[in-house]
């Protein structure tokens, strides 16, 4: 029983070239497929796996409300990013809690929503995953070698607690790299090296 949330769009990397892609274009040169909330729901249904759609929809609605009015550098509504990360997580066959955490992964970091709010609404499992993804993002470093070593340490630590945290973070980075064409050249290079 899906309510009709506000339709938003998200970019998700297509596995095949779109029909309108220039001949000979590399996958990295083609704009990712546009996915709406409705298409995400269709993909969940088409997966043939049982998902807690009430939880996933509730996570979408909270993320959509929390990020309302915020746009990415590309000009797209910010909700596009969490939707795209959730689609990548779905495509990997992950569970309802992982999809909900993917939708919520930037809410604590970027909005007034707290981990206590997430725990109250979604339980400690989802809140702990969101917290783990947030912690993987927070530390800043002065040089790339230190950053890469710390990223590896943080990934291993996250894996030891819950491998889903690392997978959500990797999906987050993957989507950011695929849609980073709006970033300045130096930021794209830095993110690529950091990842």
Where are the model-predicted features located?
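Active-site helical microenvironments for divalent-metal-assisted chemistry
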Residues: 1-195
């Amino acid at each position: 029983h899906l309510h009709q949330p506000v339709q938003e769009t998200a970019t998700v990397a297509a596995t095949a070239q779109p029909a309108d892609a220039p001949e000979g274009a590399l996958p990295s040169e083609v704009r990712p497929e546009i996915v709406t909330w409705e298409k995400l729901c269709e993909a969940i249904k088409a997966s043939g796996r049982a998902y807690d759609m009430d939880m996933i929809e509730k996570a979408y609605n909270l993320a959509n409300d929390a990020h309302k009015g915020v746009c990415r550098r590309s000009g797209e509504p910010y909700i596009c990013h969490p939707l795209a990360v959730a689609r990548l997580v779905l495509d990997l066959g992950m569970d309802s809690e992982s999809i909900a955490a993917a939708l919520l992964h930037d809410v604590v970091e970027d909005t007034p929503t707290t981990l206590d709010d997430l725990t109250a609404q979604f339980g400690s499992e989802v809140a702990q995953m969101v917290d783990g993804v947030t912690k993987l993002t927070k530390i800043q470093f002065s040089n790339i070698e230190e950053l890469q070593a710390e990223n590896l340490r943080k990934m291993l630590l996250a894996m030891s607690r819950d491998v889903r945290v690392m997978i959500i973070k990797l999906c987050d980075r993957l989507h950011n790299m695929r849609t980073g064409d709006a970033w300045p050249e130096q930021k794209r290079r830095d993110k690529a090296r950091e990842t």
